[in-house]
Amino acid sequence: MSDAHGVARDQLRAFVERIERLEEEKKTIADDIKDVYGEAKGMGFDTKILKKVIALRKKDEQERMEEDLILDTYLHALGMIENPPEG
């Protein structure tokens, strides 16, 4: 095997091993997050709502306002809310 193939093989192996380590770290973090949700649930918090709060905190105010307006538009169209959205 030529030296170039050996280098490519070593690089490929290094990438695969790095990805495998990161995947394991990701699993560990996901397990930790699950544990925190379990703690919150044990303290009486609604984890479904907690997840929504976390998702909302990831968005900026403008994005949240746009989504709320669209949601209200859909709900109004379906007769689920009375007042049409103000936008």
From Swiss-Prot:
<dbReference type="InterPro" id="IPR046367">
    <property type="entry name" value="GapR-like_DNA-bd"/>
</dbReference>
<protein>
    <recommendedName>
        <fullName>UPF0335 protein Avi_3695</fullName>
    </recommendedName>
</protein>
<dbReference type="GO" id="GO:0003677">
    <property type="term" value="F:DNA binding"/>
</dbReference>
<comment type="similarity">
    <text>Belongs to the UPF0335 family.</text>
</comment>
<dbReference type="Pfam" id="PF10073">
    <property type="entry name" value="GapR_DNA-bd"/>
</dbReference>
<dbReference type="InterPro" id="IPR018753">
    <property type="entry name" value="GapR-like"/>
</dbReference>
